[in-house]
């Protein structure tokens, strides 16, 4: 399943980085592209089994794995 999120800054996020929800890896970043002068759209591949828990009002943020680790997308709430 594909899920999209808009960010003002992706801070070094790359295609292939992990997507987490409630402390569990549920997918990976599929594509990153500009949508206008100030926003970047991140397309994610999400495991179908996880989609029932992610609501339309969920939020996505970019974090790091560990102190100097890879970037990741964290989906919360919903």
Predicted regions and their residues:
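A secondary-structure micro-motif
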Residues: 1-78
């Amino acid at each position: 399943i594909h899920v999209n999120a808009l960010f003002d800054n992706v801070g070094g996020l790359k295609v292939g980085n992990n997507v987490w929800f409630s402390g569990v890896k549920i997918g990976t970043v599929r594509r990153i592209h500009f949508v206008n002068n100030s926003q970047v759209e991140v397309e994610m591949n999400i495991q179908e089994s996880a989609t029932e828990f992610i609501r339309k009002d969920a939020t996505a943020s970019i974090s790091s794995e560990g102190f100097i680790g890879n970037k990741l997308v964290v989906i919360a709430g919903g």
